[in-house]
Every structure is written in structure tokens, then in C-alpha cells.
Amino acid sequence: MGLPTPYSFTDPLNPTPNPALESDEARVAFWEKQAQRLTWAEPWHTAHRFEKPKSLGFDEEGIEQFSIPEIKWFEGGKLNVAYNCVDRHVEAGRGDKVALYFEGEPGDREAITYAELQRRIAKAANGLLSLGVRKGDRVVIYLPVIPETIIFTLACARIGAIHSLVFGGFSAEALKFRVEDTGAKVLITTDGQNRRGKVVPVKVNADEACSGENNIEHVIVVDRTSASDPVAHAAVPWTEGRDVWYHDLVDDQPDTHAYELHDAEDPLFIIYTSGTTGKPKGLVHTMGGYLVQTAYTHALLYDLLPDYVDENGVLRPDELSAVNDPEKVESTVHWCTADLAWVTAHTYEIYGPLVNGVSEVIYEGTPNTPHYGRHFEVIERYGVTNYYTAPTLIRSLMGAFPDGPEPGKYDFSTVRLLGSVGESINPEAWRWLRQHVGGGTAAFIDTWWQSETGSTVCSPRPHDPAFAPEGTYPEGTPHCTPLPGCATRAVPGVSTRVVDEHGDPVEPGKQGFIVVDKIGPSMARTVWQNPQRFLDSYWRHYGERGWFLAGDGAKEDEEGNVYILGRIDDVINISGHRLSTIEIESALVTHPAVVEAGVCPVEDDLTGHQAVAYVTLTDEGKALTEDELKAALTAHVREHIGPIAKPKDVVAVADIPKTRSGKITRRLLGELYQGRSLGDVSSLQNEEALGHIAQVLVDTGRVSEAV
């Protein structure tokens, strides 16, 4: 069964390069045109509707209240996301094209064509239906980077179940929160995962996460690590009547499935991101708008658009085009190195590459197993053209190969595009990757976006003059000079501003707040079961103007290029993973050694930032040595949240500095640890705590002298 012929929309825009999308009408028309990238069963009746927050007056405590923002795109339109990502490519005669190149950490490999992927998704969809999963039900997927993760993700999209992927490195407690918060009916997990040459048990975490009160009816278990070992297979913990092996569920299922049609505004997935209150926020993304902007930005940033000849006689992609260049699609092998649970992978490792019909690589393990050249081997083996990764990973490769890989040892000749995501990249890492993996000529897209925006907001373009051979463009041409660590400008169809707390523009070079003042279709619609938190987190400050507050600091140069400066709230960005300081503090104070905790970010050459914990101690804690305390508390955080959240250091202090309203001054804690000037401390209720902490840091050799 195929969808009807795509509805023919009127093209409201003149297809010229670099369109000025200044008006709301032009912006909406642009996204209507880009929506033609997808196959729709029924057209929409309303392209876009945005109800900005409006003041509702003041409550009894004098706090201004606002209405909840409402964001809609392509209302009335019907489609199937999985059909758009897989089936339509098969129907177009491209079923034999490889969709996924999978490489496991132990070295096992598999090439899965679009036709085979379609078959496996159908069997998984039928399996979910046999367990009673229906449209709107939530399915939590707790799997490593393996084909089954993508298969179940698209099976959920196919039947209209809402998927929520959870990072395999998260603890049972973190998984349990997501299982309970989503009200999931099914949890999909694995017996174990391969990590740094070892098999790490996973099913035990899943079982712990399902303890207590929840809505879990079934746990599907993928046999990843014990299939060849009957003893290990039999030792996997099991709950009869609830647990089912993946192969037992799907082997006898039909390999075809008559998919359903879904409204453009039906929820597609829930993705959790840390917030300043400690409790992760479940952001809801919807089917139509998310897939439209994902399809377009993937095509724009990874060079799939058709070219035109510019005024300098150079081929450049037509940024307005709603179709891709077939030859570019066929020649692309895309690799986004993110874990599939992160939004980076949702957009540019699952949905983006597949909706555009390219081949992509997924790799299960760590980049240094069994050696630091593993990623280089993967690039060479599959002929990777696009390598999209995180600054932390680049810095780790720099540490292993300061002067680059041994000349001639690896073939990087296929690499034509590099990308960075998750945090600001330092210029040294930018230059190192471009020189040693990109041959000094590859385009480098330094992307800025968030879980909330769903897809890239700001980025250089692959064919910017900066990446053309020297002399191609006249001096003074916009974007002619490479700017390492610069997100440059917004992609077409959205726009940003850098403003002060009053919403006024800041001077070039001065730090302000970056806001998205014209949103695109992939913007999150709400926080799961908590629309008030959606308002308070993102829209309260500038919402009446229709501006989304991203929570990042930024600055612009004289030419309007955007530089992202990091978080303005109490979230730590560690290797591109956003973690709440309060969430870490909450874990620390559950340990019997700790009375109170204050956690702050400090700069780190490898991961960008790390967490440092200041703690006041109980008598039990005071009986521990410094090393014993650090070991106990880092292990405790690892168990409660996950390894990524463990503090780099633990400092025992007599008191935690706070404002007069009782808020921990995390900024000051970070400045103290890094030996920096504190500035104004007049708002503190216990200023003397600063002097004590400064002396502790000196006495323990952490800083050379007190500030």
C-alpha cells in the first residue's frame, strides 16, 4: 500500500538563492514549500498558528501570570513518518540502496538496505501491536547504538506510538524516572551492551526501573551479548509473563504492515533534557513539523541541494530548493557519532538521513576501543563523506594524535564535510580536525541548536565562500573567512537575536542572551504533562514578543556572526550532555555523609566543562579521608544519575555560600575553584563562607592563592 500522489501545493516563492525571509508570510510560505519534501496523504488547512503567551494579570503573590503558548504547523495534514523515511524510497526503486552500515564494537558488521529495513520495521510494528501497543501509547527504548534501536523507533512512528529513547549509560534511577513520567506501556532494552571491550549488563537496570508503580506491561529484550553463550543467555534476569525476547516477538510476525495515517500535530517522541529545577523536562515533538524541518536542514547542511552558478561562476546550492540532487544523495555516506538517545541523533542520525534517502553509518562502541584509530578505520571502511561529531571527541583524538594520524595510514579521501555539535568548539580542535581528517579543504559546519528547537538553528553552510579555494571570491565577500568556533547565522526560515535582559540589542562583541525570534516547524510543542513548565522555562521572559529564550549566552561580531558562549542557567554541558546542577546536588545529599551540596561547572580541556561538588558533612562524612569521600560520592552520583554526571572533584567545606533569598551561588563556587575574581558579593547572606572556601582550596593545593 502506498500513499496517494502528493498534494500539489502552490509555490508562493520565487526560487532565487539566499531568499530574504523577513516577513512572517514569507517564512510560512518557505516552510510550506519545504513541506513538499514529504509525501502527504492529505493537505493541511492551516500552515502555521502561533498563540504567543499573553499576560493574565498578577496572582496573590504579585507574580505575573501568562497564558500557555500554542504552536501549530501544517494543521489538518496527514502523513506517516516511517513511510516517508523508508517505504517511499523502496517504492521509488531504491530498495537495494544501503540505509544503514552497522559496526559493533567487537567488530561485527551488517549492511541493511532500505528494503530490508522496511521489512524489519514492519515485523517490529506488528510485534508491538501484538502486545497491545496502540497510537498514543508511550514506548521507552533503552538500547545502545544498534540497528534495533532505529527499527523500534520507526516502528513506533509507523503505528503512532510515542517513543522516548534513553541513553544506555544512564542509571536505573534515571531510567525509572522516564518510565514513570511517560507512563510507558512497554520498555525495550537489551541483555547487555559492549563498552570498552567489556560486556556491561543492562537488563538488571531495566528490571530495577520497572520496580514500583508504573504502567509497564511488557519488557522486550534484544539479545545483543549472550546469544552465542547459552550459560550467559540463561542467566539474564527474567520476569515470566512480562518479558519477551525480541527474536521471539518478531520472528513469526508478517514482514508487511499496513501503516496508519497520523495528523501532523500528533506527538512523535518525548525527549528529556535537564532543567534548573533538577527534574528533567520531557519535550514533546510532533510528526509533521519536526520531519519537515529535519528533512530540510539535513539537506541544507549536508550538501544534498541542487546547485546553481553564482555571480562568481561558482556552483553553489540553492537554499530555497525543496528537492535534492539525486547524484548527491547517491554519493553520500553520513555518520553522526552521537548516541541514538540524544536529539542530535534523532534528527541527524535517524530521521534526517533516512527521510532524505542517504546511506548512514552507526557505530556501537567508544572511539578508543580497541585503539584511538577506530573512528578513522570506520571512515575508511565505509567511505564516509559527512563526519558529524562533538568537540569532546575531537579533543580526545587530538590528545592521542597531536600531530594527526600517521601519514598514509588511513584513507580520508571520501570526507568532504565535517560538523560539530553539542557545545562550542575551540579553534584548535576545529583546525586539527579539518587539517588531519578533512585534508585542509573540507567544509566545517559548527552547528548550534537544542533539544527544544528540534533541528539546527545557526550554522555555516557547506558551500560558504570560506570553504572555497583561495581566490575564488573577492575579498570582502560575506562569510569568506573561516571562523573556527562560530555558528555564523540562522538557517533559512528561522532567525535569532542577541539581546539584553530587556530585549534590546547588545553591542557587537558584548555578551547577551540568544533568542529565536522566528521559530520553525520543529520547535517542541510542550513539556510532557507540564505545559506550565514549558512556559516558565522558555517563554516567560520574552514570550509576549514571541521570542524563545534558549538559555545560552551569545555575542555577535560586527558582521552579525553569532558566537555561542555557553549556558546562562544552572545546567552543566559535559561533552555535549546537559546535566542539571540541582539534579547532581539532589543525588549527593541522599548520601549519609552529606548535609548540603553545591555543584558548579568548571572549564575542562577535554569535555568542555566538568562538575565540581562542594559539600558540608555529617559526622559520618567527617570521619572519611579526602580520597575516601571523593570515591564514595562520585560512586554515589554515578549510581543515581550515570557516569557522565560524576564530579571531577569533591571539596569539603563548612558552609555553602547563598544569596539572601537562599539560592546557592554556583557562579561564585566556580570562580573560586578556578582562582578568578569574584566581583560583587554584596547579595550574599553568608559572605564569610567565601573566605573559608578560598582558604580550603589553597590549603589543599587546588589553587595557588586565595582570591
What residues fall within each predicted segment?
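Conserved AMP-binding/adenylation subdomain of ANL enzymes
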Residues: 292-333, 341-385, 400-405
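Conserved ATP/PPi-binding loop(s) of AMP-dependent carboxylate-activating enzymes
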Residues: 474, 478, 489-493, 504-539, ...
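Structural core segment of the AMP-binding/adenylate-forming
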Residues: 154, 158-248, 390-391
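Conserved pre-ATP/AMP-binding loop-to-beta segment of ANL
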Residues: 96-98, 220-221, 237-272, 279, ...
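Conserved beta-loop-beta connector loops within the AMP-binding
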Residues: 490, 495-518, 555-559, 622-630, ...
